[in-house]
């Protein structure tokens, strides 16, 4: 076997099709784009256009609405809190709240508040103040000897108490 005997497998390297090179090539004149019109021009794809057929976004009914008063809570799991405690970024002895979680780097921001979820294992005894918590998270914190205080979300000045 010589170096000159080495060759690619058949069809391994397919030549690209050169378009617009005469009618004999099979891809001349319109270069496979059909006749004239918007789609024969470059850079055109009409999003959601289905060739005149009623498009999907108009075939389906409208549904739901956006609640402008909905509160957006940031979720944090127990394993993330335990990681921060192990890394000495959170003090298990003091009260853990949204502010201390952001300060420690466990959360990026607190939005409208923090919701505690129960993934992972919590070894440290903690006292935590959050705006919501899952049943499994509350059970895990209490099993470790800690407490969970559920806070009421702060109301805007315009809202009735």
Curated annotation (Swiss-Prot):
Pfam families: Ribosomal_L27A
GO cellular component terms, A-Z: cytosolic large ribosomal subunit
SUPFAM superfamilies (alphabetical): Ribosomal proteins L15p and L18e
Superkingdom as given in the UniProt entry: Bacteria
Gene3D superfamilies documented for this protein: 3.100.10.10
Keywords: Ribonucleoprotein, Ribosomal protein, RNA-binding, rRNA-binding
Family indicated by similarity: Belongs to the universal ribosomal protein uL15 family.
Matching NCBIfam families: rplO_bact
Name the record gives this protein: Large ribosomal subunit protein uL15
Organism: Bradyrhizobium sp. (strain ORS 278)
Top-level taxonomy: Bacteria, Pseudomonadati, Pseudomonadota, Alphaproteobacteria, Hyphomicrobiales
């Amino acid at each position: 076997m010589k170096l000159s005997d080495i060759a690619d497998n058949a069809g391994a390297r397919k030549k690209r099709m050169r378009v617009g090179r005469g009618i004999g090539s099979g891809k001349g004149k319109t270069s496979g784009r059909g006749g004239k019109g918007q789609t024969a021009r470059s850079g055109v794809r009409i999003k959601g256009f289905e060739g005149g057929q009623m498009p999907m976004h108009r075939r389906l009914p409208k549904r739901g609405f956006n609640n402008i008063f909905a509160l957006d809570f940031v979720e944090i799991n127990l394993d993330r809190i335990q990681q921060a405690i192990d890394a000495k970024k959170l003090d298990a002895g003091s009260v853990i709240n949204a502010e201390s979680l952001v300060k420690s780097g466990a959360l990026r921001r607190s939005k409208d508040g923090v919701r505690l979820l129960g993934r992972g294992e919590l070894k440290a005894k903690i006292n935590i103040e959050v705006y919501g918590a899952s049943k499994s998270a509350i059970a895990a914190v209490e099993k470790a000897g800690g407490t969970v205080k559920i806070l009421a979300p702060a109301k805007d000045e315009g809202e009735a108490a």
